[in-house]
């Protein structure tokens, strides 16, 4: 019997086994990338609690229209709690006083109307840290406003705020820490009002 000897060229081998080789190389590279990628930063439990409390405090200050505490809350937001870009964003949307005169005028109006407000936080939901070490936190709840002249909403209004909280940087460009020297001082680096507007 006569057997035909087959000549195989590198081209034929590549055509026949090329897909398998490419798949094997791709699988190997993906395995290497998966095992050597940098780990996503994890947030400690203490820091998460600290940032949650900070988000609650900022929310209360943003919604504070009580004549007793409005000025102090607004000054705290402007000086300590918000990054300059967020201050500008909130001033442009008229959620914050644009100047000291504006702050005094609003405080005077609130005092004349004897306006008070109550904020009820329903949920504070932190997410995972972003790659640059910031913690997204969503705060939902209700705010009720009452004044002697009954101006403003007649019932509680829902709110939904989304904050991106990071560590504050001092004037020297280094991270600022609390008195314990370990806990970074938080600051709101980004803000989004996702509240549904009342009809």
Where are these regions (language model features)?
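Hydrophobic membrane-insertion alpha-helices, especially the h-region
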Residues: 18-35
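Structured, amphipathic secondary-structure segments that form assembly/contact surfaces
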Residues: 2-20, 37-45, 49, 64, ...
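Active-site-proximal helix/loop capping residues that flank conserved catalytic or ligand/cofactor
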Residues: 26-28, 56, 75-76
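N-terminal alpha-helical signal peptides/signal-anchor transmembrane segments
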Residues: 55-66
